[in-house]
Protein backbone atom coordinates (compact mmCIF):
# COMPACT_ATOMS: atom_id res chain seq x y z
CA UNK A 1 0.00 0.00 0.00
CA UNK A 2 1.27 3.49 -0.86
CA UNK A 3 2.50 5.75 1.94
CA UNK A 4 1.29 8.83 0.03
CA UNK A 5 -1.92 10.42 1.32
CA UNK A 6 -3.96 12.30 -1.29
CA UNK A 7 -5.15 15.70 -0.08
CA UNK A 8 -8.62 16.47 -1.41
CA UNK A 9 -9.50 20.08 -0.63
CA UNK A 10 -13.17 21.07 -0.50
CA UNK A 11 -12.81 24.66 0.74
CA UNK A 12 -14.63 25.98 -2.34
CA UNK A 13 -17.51 23.51 -2.03
CA UNK A 14 -18.17 22.31 1.52
CA UNK A 15 -16.24 25.23 3.01
CA UNK A 16 -18.19 27.85 1.09
CA UNK A 17 -21.47 26.39 2.32
CA UNK A 18 -20.69 27.87 5.74
CA UNK A 19 -20.38 31.46 4.49
CA UNK A 20 -23.00 34.12 5.04
CA UNK A 21 -22.45 35.36 1.48
CA UNK A 22 -21.22 33.44 -1.55
CA UNK A 23 -17.78 34.14 -2.96
CA UNK A 24 -17.51 35.80 -6.36
CA UNK A 25 -16.00 33.92 -9.29
CA UNK A 26 -12.87 36.07 -8.99
CA UNK A 27 -12.52 35.29 -5.28
CA UNK A 28 -12.99 31.56 -5.88
CA UNK A 29 -10.31 31.66 -8.56
CA UNK A 30 -7.92 33.42 -6.18
CA UNK A 31 -8.42 30.67 -3.62
CA UNK A 32 -8.11 27.93 -6.27
CA UNK A 33 -4.77 29.31 -7.44
CA UNK A 34 -3.59 29.49 -3.83
CA UNK A 35 -4.61 25.85 -3.34
CA UNK A 36 -2.67 24.94 -6.47
CA UNK A 37 0.45 26.64 -5.04
CA UNK A 38 -0.19 24.82 -1.76
CA UNK A 39 0.02 21.54 -3.64
CA UNK A 40 -3.39 19.96 -3.06
CA UNK A 41 -3.89 16.88 -5.22
CA UNK A 42 -7.60 17.39 -5.84
CA UNK A 43 -9.74 20.48 -5.32
CA UNK A 44 -13.53 20.22 -5.21
CA UNK A 45 -14.63 23.62 -6.41
CA UNK A 46 -18.41 23.58 -6.55
CA UNK A 47 -21.77 21.98 -7.27
CA UNK A 48 -22.46 23.05 -10.90
CA UNK A 49 -26.13 22.07 -11.07
CA UNK A 50 -26.99 24.21 -8.03
CA UNK A 51 -26.78 27.61 -9.76
CA UNK A 52 -25.45 29.38 -12.88
CA UNK A 53 -22.90 31.16 -10.67
CA UNK A 54 -21.54 27.89 -9.33
CA UNK A 55 -21.38 26.45 -12.85
CA UNK A 56 -19.42 29.49 -14.05
CA UNK A 57 -16.95 29.37 -11.17
CA UNK A 58 -16.31 25.63 -11.65
CA UNK A 59 -15.76 26.16 -15.37
CA UNK A 60 -13.43 29.14 -14.80
CA UNK A 61 -11.31 27.25 -12.29
CA UNK A 62 -11.27 24.11 -14.46
CA UNK A 63 -9.96 26.19 -17.37
CA UNK A 64 -7.25 27.86 -15.28
CA UNK A 65 -5.82 25.34 -12.80
CA UNK A 66 -3.24 22.98 -14.31
CA UNK A 67 -1.34 21.27 -11.48
CA UNK A 68 -4.21 20.02 -9.32
CA UNK A 69 -7.12 17.83 -10.40
CA UNK A 70 -10.36 19.83 -10.42
CA UNK A 71 -13.49 18.11 -9.10
CA UNK A 72 -17.18 18.97 -9.01
CA UNK A 73 -19.96 17.49 -6.89
CA UNK A 74 -23.16 15.89 -8.14
CA UNK A 75 -26.01 13.97 -6.62
CA UNK A 76 -26.70 10.49 -7.99
CA UNK A 77 -28.79 12.07 -10.75
CA UNK A 78 -28.01 12.26 -14.46
CA UNK A 79 -28.82 15.99 -14.68
CA UNK A 80 -26.32 16.72 -11.90
CA UNK A 81 -23.64 14.60 -13.55
CA UNK A 82 -24.30 16.27 -16.92
CA UNK A 83 -23.81 19.72 -15.38
CA UNK A 84 -20.62 18.65 -13.62
CA UNK A 85 -19.19 17.07 -16.77
CA UNK A 86 -20.02 20.11 -18.88
CA UNK A 87 -18.45 22.55 -16.42
CA UNK A 88 -15.33 20.40 -16.05
CA UNK A 89 -14.88 19.55 -19.73
CA UNK A 90 -12.47 22.47 -20.26
CA UNK A 91 -10.01 21.03 -17.71
CA UNK A 92 -6.89 19.06 -18.60
CA UNK A 93 -7.81 16.55 -15.88
CA UNK A 94 -10.95 16.35 -13.79
CA UNK A 95 -12.98 14.24 -11.39
CA UNK A 96 -16.73 13.82 -10.96
CA UNK A 97 -17.78 13.24 -7.36
CA UNK A 98 -21.24 11.73 -7.01
CA UNK A 99 -22.94 10.76 -3.77
CA UNK A 100 -26.06 9.36 -2.14
CA UNK A 101 -27.16 8.79 1.46
CA UNK A 102 -26.65 5.31 2.87
CA UNK A 103 -27.58 5.49 6.57
CA UNK A 104 -30.96 4.10 7.61
CA UNK A 105 -32.20 7.47 8.89
CA UNK A 106 -31.26 9.18 5.62
CA UNK A 107 -32.54 6.42 3.35
CA UNK A 108 -35.91 6.17 5.10
CA UNK A 109 -36.52 9.75 6.28
CA UNK A 110 -34.84 11.85 3.60
CA UNK A 111 -34.91 9.72 0.45
CA UNK A 112 -37.98 7.67 1.43
CA UNK A 113 -36.69 4.65 -0.45
CA UNK A 114 -35.42 1.18 0.34
CA UNK A 115 -31.71 0.50 0.61
CA UNK A 116 -31.86 -1.66 -2.53
CA UNK A 117 -33.34 1.26 -4.47
CA UNK A 118 -30.60 3.56 -3.21
CA UNK A 119 -27.97 0.98 -4.15
CA UNK A 120 -29.37 0.83 -7.68
CA UNK A 121 -29.25 4.64 -7.95
CA UNK A 122 -25.65 4.70 -6.76
CA UNK A 123 -24.50 2.08 -9.26
CA UNK A 124 -26.34 3.85 -12.07
CA UNK A 125 -24.78 7.20 -11.17
CA UNK A 126 -21.24 5.83 -11.11
CA UNK A 127 -21.70 4.08 -14.46
CA UNK A 128 -23.15 7.25 -15.99
CA UNK A 129 -20.31 9.41 -14.65
CA UNK A 130 -17.78 6.99 -16.14
CA UNK A 131 -19.04 7.99 -19.60
CA UNK A 132 -17.29 11.34 -19.08
CA UNK A 133 -14.14 10.41 -17.14
CA UNK A 134 -12.26 7.46 -15.67
CA UNK A 135 -11.84 9.46 -12.46
CA UNK A 136 -15.11 8.99 -10.60
CA UNK A 137 -15.46 9.30 -6.85
CA UNK A 138 -18.46 7.92 -5.00
CA UNK A 139 -19.49 8.99 -1.48
CA UNK A 140 -21.68 7.08 0.97
CA UNK A 141 -23.27 10.04 2.73
CA UNK A 142 -23.59 9.52 6.51
CA UNK A 143 -21.40 6.42 6.29
CA UNK A 144 -20.55 6.80 9.98
CA UNK A 145 -24.14 5.87 10.88
CA UNK A 146 -24.69 3.31 8.12
CA UNK A 147 -25.15 -0.37 9.12
CA UNK A 148 -21.82 -2.01 8.32
CA UNK A 149 -23.33 -4.76 6.16
CA UNK A 150 -25.05 -2.17 3.98
CA UNK A 151 -21.90 -0.05 3.81
CA UNK A 152 -19.75 -3.00 2.69
CA UNK A 153 -22.29 -3.91 0.04
CA UNK A 154 -22.54 -0.33 -1.24
CA UNK A 155 -18.76 0.06 -1.46
CA UNK A 156 -18.31 -3.24 -3.31
CA UNK A 157 -21.00 -2.43 -5.88
CA UNK A 158 -19.76 1.14 -6.44
CA UNK A 159 -16.26 -0.18 -7.16
CA UNK A 160 -17.70 -2.76 -9.57
CA UNK A 161 -19.56 0.07 -11.34
CA UNK A 162 -16.30 1.92 -11.93
CA UNK A 163 -15.65 4.23 -8.96
CA UNK A 164 -11.91 4.69 -8.46
CA UNK A 165 -12.25 6.55 -5.17
CA UNK A 166 -14.71 5.57 -2.45
CA UNK A 167 -15.37 8.23 0.14
CA UNK A 168 -16.49 7.31 3.67
CA UNK A 169 -17.88 10.48 5.28
CA UNK A 170 -18.61 11.02 8.95
CA UNK A 171 -21.21 13.49 7.74
CA UNK A 172 -22.51 14.61 11.14
CA UNK A 173 -19.24 14.24 13.05
CA UNK A 174 -20.72 11.51 15.25
CA UNK A 175 -18.08 8.79 15.45
CA UNK A 176 -15.09 8.57 17.77
CA UNK A 177 -11.65 7.55 16.42
CA UNK A 178 -11.73 3.91 17.57
CA UNK A 179 -15.17 3.49 16.00
CA UNK A 180 -14.29 5.23 12.75
CA UNK A 181 -11.01 3.35 12.44
CA UNK A 182 -12.97 0.14 12.92
CA UNK A 183 -15.29 1.03 10.03
CA UNK A 184 -12.33 1.55 7.70
CA UNK A 185 -10.66 -1.65 8.86
CA UNK A 186 -13.87 -3.63 8.34
CA UNK A 187 -14.16 -2.38 4.77
CA UNK A 188 -10.62 -3.58 4.04
CA UNK A 189 -11.39 -6.93 5.65
CA UNK A 190 -14.77 -7.60 4.02
CA UNK A 191 -14.93 -5.86 0.63
CA UNK A 192 -13.27 -8.24 -1.88
CA UNK A 193 -12.44 -5.60 -4.52
CA UNK A 194 -11.29 -2.90 -2.07
CA UNK A 195 -7.81 -2.87 -3.63
CA UNK A 196 -9.29 -1.49 -6.86
CA UNK A 197 -10.14 1.89 -5.31
CA UNK A 198 -8.62 4.52 -3.06
CA UNK A 199 -10.49 4.79 0.23
CA UNK A 200 -11.17 8.39 1.21
CA UNK A 201 -12.58 9.97 4.36
CA UNK A 202 -14.53 13.19 4.87
CA UNK A 203 -14.94 13.99 8.56
CA UNK A 204 -16.94 16.79 10.16
CA UNK A 205 -16.09 18.48 13.43
CA UNK A 206 -19.37 18.46 15.36
CA UNK A 207 -17.67 16.75 18.30
CA UNK A 208 -14.23 18.21 17.59
CA UNK A 209 -12.92 14.87 16.27
CA UNK A 210 -12.60 15.44 12.51
CA UNK A 211 -8.80 15.53 12.47
CA UNK A 212 -8.43 12.65 14.93
CA UNK A 213 -10.87 10.51 12.93
CA UNK A 214 -9.06 11.30 9.68
CA UNK A 215 -5.66 10.37 11.11
CA UNK A 216 -7.10 7.15 12.52
CA UNK A 217 -8.57 6.36 9.11
CA UNK A 218 -5.23 6.62 7.30
CA UNK A 219 -3.67 4.45 9.99
CA UNK A 220 -6.21 1.80 8.97
CA UNK A 221 -5.60 2.08 5.23
CA UNK A 222 -7.45 5.14 3.89
CA UNK A 223 -5.27 7.10 1.47
CA UNK A 224 -7.29 10.24 0.76
CA UNK A 225 -8.36 12.87 3.29
CA UNK A 226 -10.99 15.45 2.40
CA UNK A 227 -10.43 18.71 4.24
CA UNK A 228 -10.68 22.49 4.09
CA UNK A 229 -8.37 25.41 4.78
CA UNK A 230 -8.88 26.63 8.36
CA UNK A 231 -11.38 23.79 8.82
CA UNK A 232 -14.30 25.88 7.53
CA UNK A 233 -17.49 24.11 6.51
CA UNK A 234 -21.01 23.05 7.41
CA UNK A 235 -21.99 23.57 11.08
CA UNK A 236 -18.84 23.11 13.18
CA UNK A 237 -16.67 22.74 10.10
CA UNK A 238 -14.53 20.14 8.37
CA UNK A 239 -11.23 18.45 8.95
CA UNK A 240 -8.53 21.14 8.85
CA UNK A 241 -6.10 20.83 5.94
CA UNK A 242 -3.24 22.57 7.71
CA UNK A 243 -3.55 20.35 10.76
CA UNK A 244 -3.56 17.16 8.67
CA UNK A 245 -0.57 18.32 6.62
CA UNK A 246 1.53 19.22 9.64
CA UNK A 247 0.55 16.11 11.63
CA UNK A 248 1.69 13.88 8.77
CA UNK A 249 4.86 15.95 8.38
CA UNK A 250 5.75 16.37 12.06
CA UNK A 251 4.93 12.75 12.97
CA UNK A 252 6.21 11.14 9.78
CA UNK A 253 8.48 8.84 11.77
CA UNK A 254 5.52 7.51 13.74
CA UNK A 255 2.92 7.40 10.96
CA UNK A 256 5.11 6.63 7.95
CA UNK A 257 2.90 8.74 5.68
CA UNK A 258 3.42 11.85 3.58
CA UNK A 259 1.56 14.37 1.41
CA UNK A 260 2.46 16.58 -1.52
CA UNK A 261 1.61 19.76 0.39
CA UNK A 262 4.06 22.67 0.16
CA UNK A 263 3.86 23.59 3.84
CA UNK A 264 5.53 26.97 3.34
CA UNK A 265 2.32 28.11 1.60
CA UNK A 266 0.08 27.19 4.55
CA UNK A 267 0.11 30.54 6.35
CA UNK A 268 -0.41 32.58 3.19
CA UNK A 269 -3.28 30.35 2.03
CA UNK A 270 -4.92 30.40 5.46
CA UNK A 271 -4.78 34.20 5.57
CA UNK A 272 -6.24 34.52 2.06
CA UNK A 273 -9.16 32.19 2.84
CA UNK A 274 -9.83 33.97 6.13
CA UNK A 275 -9.85 37.36 4.41
CA UNK A 276 -11.96 36.46 1.37
CA UNK A 277 -14.44 34.37 3.37
CA UNK A 278 -14.64 36.97 6.15
CA UNK A 279 -14.06 34.23 8.71
CA UNK A 280 -11.37 35.22 11.25
CA UNK A 281 -9.12 32.42 12.47
CA UNK A 282 -9.39 31.96 16.23
CA UNK A 283 -6.18 32.97 17.99
CA UNK A 284 -5.59 29.53 19.52
CA UNK A 285 -6.25 27.62 16.28
CA UNK A 286 -3.62 24.92 15.74
CA UNK A 287 -0.94 25.71 13.14
CA UNK A 288 -2.37 29.01 11.80
CA UNK A 289 -3.81 30.81 14.84
CA UNK A 290 -2.14 34.05 15.93
CA UNK A 291 -0.97 32.36 19.13
CA UNK A 292 0.25 29.12 17.53
CA UNK A 293 3.88 30.26 17.72
CA UNK A 294 3.49 32.82 20.49
CA UNK A 295 4.92 32.32 23.96
CA UNK A 296 3.83 34.42 26.95
CA UNK A 297 4.92 32.39 29.97
CA UNK A 298 8.26 33.53 31.35
CA UNK A 299 9.36 29.91 31.86
CA UNK A 300 8.46 29.01 28.27
CA UNK A 301 10.16 32.13 26.92
CA UNK A 302 13.35 31.34 28.80
CA UNK A 303 13.31 27.80 27.41
CA UNK A 304 12.72 29.07 23.87
CA UNK A 305 15.71 31.39 24.08
CA UNK A 306 17.91 28.47 25.14
CA UNK A 307 16.58 25.95 22.60
CA UNK A 308 13.65 26.54 20.26
CA UNK A 309 12.47 22.93 20.33
CA UNK A 310 11.90 23.04 24.09
CA UNK A 311 8.42 24.43 23.41
CA UNK A 312 7.96 24.20 19.63
CA UNK A 313 7.45 20.91 17.80
CA UNK A 314 7.60 22.65 14.42
CA UNK A 315 9.03 25.96 13.30
CA UNK A 316 6.98 28.96 12.18
CA UNK A 317 9.19 29.06 9.08
CA UNK A 318 7.91 25.60 8.12
CA UNK A 319 4.44 27.05 7.40
CA UNK A 320 5.72 30.27 5.83
CA UNK A 321 5.94 32.53 8.89
CA UNK A 322 9.10 34.53 9.45
CA UNK A 323 9.46 33.99 13.19
CA UNK A 324 7.83 33.02 16.45
CA UNK A 325 6.63 35.60 18.97
CA UNK A 326 7.65 36.06 22.55
CA UNK A 327 4.83 38.20 23.91
CA UNK A 328 6.18 40.71 26.39
CA UNK A 329 3.78 40.64 29.34
CA UNK A 330 4.04 40.93 33.11
CA UNK A 331 4.98 37.23 33.12
CA UNK A 332 8.10 37.83 31.00
CA UNK A 333 11.42 37.61 32.79
CA UNK A 334 14.47 39.89 32.58
CA UNK A 335 16.10 37.47 30.16
CA UNK A 336 13.35 38.04 27.58
CA UNK A 337 13.53 41.83 27.86
CA UNK A 338 17.30 41.81 27.55
CA UNK A 339 17.08 39.47 24.55
CA UNK A 340 14.53 41.69 22.82
CA UNK A 341 16.61 44.82 23.40
CA UNK A 342 19.57 42.99 21.90
CA UNK A 343 17.47 42.05 18.84
CA UNK A 344 16.54 45.72 18.51
CA UNK A 345 20.25 46.59 18.37
CA UNK A 346 21.01 47.81 21.89
CA UNK A 347 23.95 46.79 24.06
CA UNK A 348 24.07 46.65 27.87
CA UNK A 349 25.76 50.05 27.94
CA UNK A 350 22.85 51.75 26.13
CA UNK A 351 20.28 51.48 28.93
CA UNK A 352 19.83 50.65 32.62
CA UNK A 353 18.39 47.12 32.75
CA UNK A 354 17.21 47.41 36.36
CA UNK A 355 15.27 50.61 35.69
CA UNK A 356 13.95 49.34 32.36
CA UNK A 357 12.64 46.08 33.80
CA UNK A 358 10.97 47.83 36.74
CA UNK A 359 9.24 50.30 34.39
CA UNK A 360 8.36 47.45 32.03
CA UNK A 361 6.50 45.54 34.75
CA UNK A 362 4.50 48.64 35.69
CA UNK A 363 3.49 49.24 32.06
CA UNK A 364 2.77 45.54 31.44
CA UNK A 365 0.45 45.40 34.46
CA UNK A 366 -1.36 48.43 33.08
CA UNK A 367 -1.79 47.52 29.40
CA UNK A 368 -1.20 43.76 29.17
CA UNK A 369 1.06 43.25 26.16
CA UNK A 370 4.05 45.54 25.67
CA UNK A 371 5.32 46.13 22.14
CA UNK A 372 8.78 46.99 20.82
CA UNK A 373 7.99 50.69 20.56
CA UNK A 374 6.80 50.69 24.18
CA UNK A 375 10.03 49.02 25.29
CA UNK A 376 12.22 51.50 23.43
CA UNK A 377 10.25 54.42 24.82
CA UNK A 378 10.67 53.07 28.35
CA UNK A 379 14.40 52.79 27.83
CA UNK A 380 15.06 56.18 26.28
CA UNK A 381 12.26 58.60 27.19
CA UNK A 382 11.97 60.06 30.66
CA UNK A 383 8.27 60.94 30.44
CA UNK A 384 6.37 57.72 29.85
CA UNK A 385 2.93 58.42 31.28
CA UNK A 386 0.50 57.24 28.62
CA UNK A 387 -1.97 59.95 29.55
CA UNK A 388 0.61 62.64 28.73
CA UNK A 389 -0.28 62.48 25.06
CA UNK A 390 0.99 64.72 22.29
CA UNK A 391 -2.34 64.39 20.46
CA UNK A 392 -5.74 64.55 22.16
CA UNK A 393 -9.19 64.36 20.59
CA UNK A 394 -11.34 67.22 21.90
CA UNK A 395 -14.38 67.14 19.62
CA UNK A 396 -15.79 65.10 16.75
CA UNK A 397 -18.84 66.00 14.64
CA UNK A 398 -19.91 63.84 11.69
CA UNK A 399 -22.66 64.35 9.11
CA UNK A 400 -23.53 61.50 6.72
CA UNK A 401 -25.32 61.58 3.37
CA UNK A 402 -27.33 58.35 3.29
CA UNK A 403 -28.16 58.72 -0.41
CA UNK A 404 -24.60 59.13 -1.72
CA UNK A 405 -22.70 57.28 1.01
CA UNK A 406 -20.36 60.23 1.64
CA UNK A 407 -19.79 61.96 4.97
CA UNK A 408 -18.30 65.16 6.38
CA UNK A 409 -16.32 65.20 9.62
CA UNK A 410 -15.12 68.13 11.70
CA UNK A 411 -12.56 67.52 14.45
CA UNK A 412 -10.82 69.50 17.14
CA UNK A 413 -7.48 67.95 18.04
CA UNK A 414 -5.10 69.20 20.68
CA UNK A 415 -1.59 69.08 19.27
CA UNK A 416 1.12 69.66 21.85
CA UNK A 417 -1.22 71.85 23.89
CA UNK A 418 -2.72 73.83 20.99
CA UNK A 419 -6.18 73.23 19.52
CA UNK A 420 -6.40 72.63 15.77
CA UNK A 421 -9.75 72.42 13.93
CA UNK A 422 -10.09 70.68 10.56
CA UNK A 423 -12.82 69.20 8.35
CA UNK A 424 -12.82 66.61 5.58
CA UNK A 425 -15.15 64.71 3.26
CA UNK A 426 -14.77 60.97 2.98
CA UNK A 427 -16.30 57.74 1.75
CA UNK A 428 -18.32 57.15 4.91
CA UNK A 429 -18.03 58.62 8.42
CA UNK A 430 -14.90 56.75 9.53
CA UNK A 431 -12.99 57.67 6.38
CA UNK A 432 -14.03 61.32 6.71
CA UNK A 433 -13.06 61.43 10.38
CA UNK A 434 -9.66 59.85 9.68
CA UNK A 435 -8.94 62.37 6.93
CA UNK A 436 -9.90 65.27 9.19
CA UNK A 437 -7.68 64.01 12.02
CA UNK A 438 -4.79 63.52 9.58
CA UNK A 439 -5.14 67.13 8.44
CA UNK A 440 -5.30 68.45 11.98
CA UNK A 441 -2.30 66.46 13.18
CA UNK A 442 -0.14 66.48 10.09
CA UNK A 443 0.31 62.70 10.49
CA UNK A 444 0.01 60.43 7.49
CA UNK A 445 -0.48 56.88 8.75
CA UNK A 446 -1.28 53.80 6.67
CA UNK A 447 -4.04 51.72 8.29
CA UNK A 448 -3.35 48.05 7.46
CA UNK A 449 -5.94 46.37 9.69
CA UNK A 450 -9.28 47.47 11.19
CA UNK A 451 -11.37 45.30 13.51
CA UNK A 452 -14.63 46.19 15.21
CA UNK A 453 -15.83 44.43 18.35
CA UNK A 454 -17.83 45.15 21.49
CA UNK A 455 -17.28 45.33 25.23
CA UNK A 456 -20.31 44.58 27.36
CA UNK A 457 -23.83 43.61 26.36
CA UNK A 458 -27.04 45.23 25.21
CA UNK A 459 -27.57 48.97 25.06
CA UNK A 460 -24.67 49.64 27.44
CA UNK A 461 -22.13 47.91 25.20
CA UNK A 462 -19.09 49.88 24.08
CA UNK A 463 -17.77 49.62 20.56
CA UNK A 464 -14.11 48.58 20.50
CA UNK A 465 -11.99 49.33 17.47
CA UNK A 466 -8.56 47.74 17.07
CA UNK A 467 -6.33 49.01 14.29
CA UNK A 468 -2.88 48.19 13.04
CA UNK A 469 -1.01 50.95 11.26
CA UNK A 470 2.25 51.03 9.34
CA UNK A 471 4.60 53.93 10.00
CA UNK A 472 8.22 54.01 8.84
CA UNK A 473 8.30 50.24 8.29
CA UNK A 474 7.01 49.47 11.77
CA UNK A 475 3.57 48.27 12.87
CA UNK A 476 1.68 50.06 15.65
CA UNK A 477 -1.47 48.85 17.41
CA UNK A 478 -4.19 51.24 18.55
CA UNK A 479 -7.39 50.65 20.51
CA UNK A 480 -10.43 52.91 20.91
CA UNK A 481 -13.52 52.46 23.10
CA UNK A 482 -16.74 54.49 22.85
CA UNK A 483 -20.50 54.05 22.60
CA UNK A 484 -20.21 55.44 19.05
CA UNK A 485 -18.27 53.37 16.52
CA UNK A 486 -16.90 56.41 14.66
CA UNK A 487 -15.64 57.93 17.90
CA UNK A 488 -14.05 54.61 18.88
CA UNK A 489 -12.36 54.52 15.47
CA UNK A 490 -10.93 58.01 15.88
CA UNK A 491 -9.73 57.23 19.41
CA UNK A 492 -7.88 54.20 18.05
CA UNK A 493 -6.25 56.38 15.39
CA UNK A 494 -5.23 59.01 17.95
CA UNK A 495 -3.79 56.21 20.09
CA UNK A 496 -1.61 55.13 17.15
CA UNK A 497 -0.60 58.72 16.43
CA UNK A 498 0.71 59.11 19.97
CA UNK A 499 2.63 55.87 19.64
CA UNK A 500 4.24 57.02 16.39
CA UNK A 501 5.10 60.37 17.98
CA UNK A 502 6.87 58.55 20.79
CA UNK A 503 8.58 56.33 18.23
CA UNK A 504 9.97 59.43 16.50
CA UNK A 505 11.30 60.67 19.84
CA UNK A 506 12.89 57.28 20.47
CA UNK A 507 14.46 57.41 17.01
CA UNK A 508 16.04 60.74 17.94
CA UNK A 509 17.43 59.18 21.11
CA UNK A 510 18.78 56.22 19.15
CA UNK A 511 20.47 58.57 16.71
CA UNK A 512 22.16 60.40 19.59
CA UNK A 513 23.37 57.08 21.00
CA UNK A 514 24.86 56.12 17.64
CA UNK A 515 26.54 59.50 17.31
CA UNK A 516 28.02 59.17 20.79
CA UNK A 517 29.31 55.69 19.93
CA UNK A 518 30.94 57.02 16.78
CA UNK A 519 32.59 59.86 18.72
CA UNK A 520 33.88 57.46 21.37
CA UNK A 521 35.06 55.06 18.69
CA UNK A 522 37.02 57.82 16.99
CA UNK A 523 38.82 58.95 20.13
From Swiss-Prot:
Pfam families the UniProt entry points to: HCS_D2, HMGL-like, LeuA_dimer
Cofactor: Mn(2+)
Catalytic activity: 3-methyl-2-oxobutanoate + acetyl-CoA + H2O = (2S)-2-isopropylmalate + CoA + H(+)
First and last residue of the signal peptide: none
Binding residues for Mn(2+): 14, 202, 204, 238
Gene Ontology biological process terms, A to Z: L-leucine biosynthetic process
Database matches in SUPFAM superfamilies: 2-isopropylmalate synthase LeuA, allosteric (dimerisation) domain (SSF110921), Aldolase (SSF51569)
Record localization: Cytoplasm
Domain of life: Bacteria
CDD domains: DRE_TIM_IPMS
Enzyme Commission identifier(s): 2.3.3.13
Role noted for this protein: Catalyzes the condensation of the acetyl group of acetyl-CoA with 3-methyl-2-oxobutanoate (2-ketoisovalerate) to form 3-carboxy-3-hydroxy-4-methylpentanoate (2-isopropylmalate).
Protein name: 2-isopropylmalate synthase
Organism: Shewanella piezotolerans (strain WP3 / JCM 13877)
Amino acid sequence: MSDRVIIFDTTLRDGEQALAASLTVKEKLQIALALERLGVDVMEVGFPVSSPGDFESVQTIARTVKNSRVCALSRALEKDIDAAAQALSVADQFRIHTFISTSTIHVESKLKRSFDQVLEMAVGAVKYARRFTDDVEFSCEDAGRTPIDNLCRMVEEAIKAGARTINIPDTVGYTVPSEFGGIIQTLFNRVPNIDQAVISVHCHDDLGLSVANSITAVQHGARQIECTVNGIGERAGNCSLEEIAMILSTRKGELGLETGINAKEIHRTSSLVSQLCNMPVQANKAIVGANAFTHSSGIHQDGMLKAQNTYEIMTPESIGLNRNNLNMTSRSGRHVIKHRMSELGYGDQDYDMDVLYEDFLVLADKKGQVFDYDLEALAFMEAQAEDDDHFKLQQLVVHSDSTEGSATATVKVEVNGETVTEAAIGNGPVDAAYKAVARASGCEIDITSYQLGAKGEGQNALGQVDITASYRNQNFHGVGLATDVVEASVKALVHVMNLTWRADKVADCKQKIQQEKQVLGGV
